């Protein structure tokens, strides 16, 4: 609440336009760009870029300021893009060193392992998601292509006892963009 009180009544600008700003309570040590919000073009908001959330990068951002800072920060942005690779992200998450702001927070780099899964509830949530966004849940087609789920029967053909859930695509900064659910009857992405 301290930051909210200290910035009350202030408006942040990027050039001549009010800046789009977002809040999140914790990260794994990196923030990401707007590609995490489906349908949002990250390049439309170059000031919201994936980068390490640490004192070194924050100081560089403060020093550069303005629109020229995006170009000057290219090496930092390339660093964040490496985290799109699952093996790089996994290695990064295994590291506990670094001067990341949130490293002492309880939800910093958390993990969760379930011994059992309410599969019926999970598949129901997947179906609800497919109905809400027709281009977000996919099943394999006969020729190996991925087809958007439009009918519940197409989803049901690929469900069943879950064998594995894994991240198959990450955004710059390492945020999970896509999951693959492998079941006894097929796959859902």
Language-model regions, residue ranges each:
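Conserved, single-site charged/polar hotspot
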Residues: 1-189
């Amino acid at each position: 609440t301290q930051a909210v009180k200290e910035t009350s009544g202030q408006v942040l600008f990027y050039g001549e336009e009010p800046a789009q700003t977002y809040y999140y309570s914790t990260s794994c040590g990196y923030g990401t760009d707007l590609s995490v919000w489906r349908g949002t073009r990250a390049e439309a908001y170059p000031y919201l870029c994936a980068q390490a959330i640490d004192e070194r990068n924050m100081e560089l951002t403060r020093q550069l300021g303005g629109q020229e800072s995006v170009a000057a920060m290219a090496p930092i942005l390339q660093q964040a893009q490496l985290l799109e690779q699952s093996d790089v992200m996994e290695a990064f998450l295994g590291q506990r060193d670094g001067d990341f702001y949130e490293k002492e927070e309880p939800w910093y780099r958390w993990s969760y392992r379930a011994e059992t899964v309410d599969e019926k509830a999970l598949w129901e949530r997947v179906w609800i998601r497919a109905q809400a966004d027709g281009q977000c849940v996919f099943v394999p087609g006969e020729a190996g292509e991925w087809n958007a789920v439009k009918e519940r029967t197409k989803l049901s053909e690929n469900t069943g006892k879950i064998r594995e859930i894994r991240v198959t695509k990450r955004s710059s900064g390492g945020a999970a963009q896509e999951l693959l659910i492998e079941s006894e009857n097929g796959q859902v992405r």
